[in-house]
Amino acid sequence: MEPHLLMLGFLSFTIVPGCWAELCLYDPPEVPNATFKALSYKNGTILNCECKRGFRRLNELVYMACLGNSWSNNCQCTSNSHDNSREQVTPQPEGQKEQQTTDTQKSTQSVYQENLAGHCREPPPWRHEDTKRIYHFVEGQIVLYTCIQGYKALQRGPAISICKTVCGEIRWTHPQLTCVDEKEHHQFLASEESQGSRNSFPESEASCPTPNTDFSQLTEATTTMETFVFTKEYQVAVASCIFLLLSILLLSGFTWQHRWRKSRRTI
């Protein structure tokens, strides 16, 4: 069974055999002068089959997915030109193919024998692959950040980012890492030591709005609305009473005038 990608409104899901994984809609956060890398990929992760310029995907293989401990499909690129005889690989005998596949599998198993259940290692490169790989991570994925050459790390916490549910939505946590020039490292280090851990606090507590604030705002709005409604109803009631009183007085006046004229005619 092949994995499929399902887009439903603003939510993205990956459907793989025996797995329903929600995708992280955004890429991991960028840290200046640092790069990130996943040491392993969770079950359901998707990698686009991208080819470098002048080449295209072969057999319409759009992506490969992490299923269990291995990647489904194999990305292949072929030349866009009609004369691509040099890019064609001479077919090998079936026995030689099987032997080569077996050797490759043994080599892969020996290197990645510590694979975690439900995780895949970095997929092997393919010919004419694009320089940048585009992954679609799933919830629970962890990426590790490292400073580029010429920079050193200043960190108050783990230099990792995790795709997880925060405040009811899936997002990446921000890595506690700052990369500074090696020549200025000692200056920043002294500043960091003076600050200590004053600014360190869990992201879940810092990012989520306080429920009490929303409740107080809602209560205030409700009270204001009730006051407005009460004032308007009061004005309507007063106006109705005045109108009724004037009607009674006017009716009484007409009645008295009618009786007075009648009594005068009798006399």
From Swiss-Prot:
Membrane topology (UniProt): Single-pass type I membrane protein
GO CC annotations on file: cell surface; external side of plasma membrane
Biased composition (Low complexity): 98-108
Xref: InterPro entries: IL-2_rcpt_alpha, Sushi/SCR/CCP_sf, Sushi_SCR_CCP_dom
Compositional bias segments (type: Polar residues): 82-93, 192-215
Region span, Disordered: 82-108, 191-215
Topological region Cytoplasmic: 257-267
Domain named Sushi: residues: 22-79, 118-181
Pfam family, any one: Sushi
Subcellular location, record wording: Membrane
Chief place of localization: membrane
Cysteine disulfide partners in this protein: C24-C66, C49-C75, C51-C77, C120-C163, C147-C179
BP terms from Gene Ontology: activated T cell proliferation; activation-induced cell death of T cells; inflammatory response; inflammatory response to antigenic stimulus; interleukin-2-mediated signaling pathway; lymphocyte proliferation; negative regulation of inflammatory response; negative regulation of lymphocyte proliferation
Gene Ontology terms, MF aspect: interleukin-2 binding; interleukin-2 receptor activity
Function per UniProt: Receptor for interleukin-2. The receptor is involved in the regulation of immune tolerance by controlling regulatory T cells (TREGs) activity. TREGs suppress the activation and expansion of autoreactive T-cells.
Name the UniProt record assigns to this protein: Interleukin-2 receptor subunit alpha
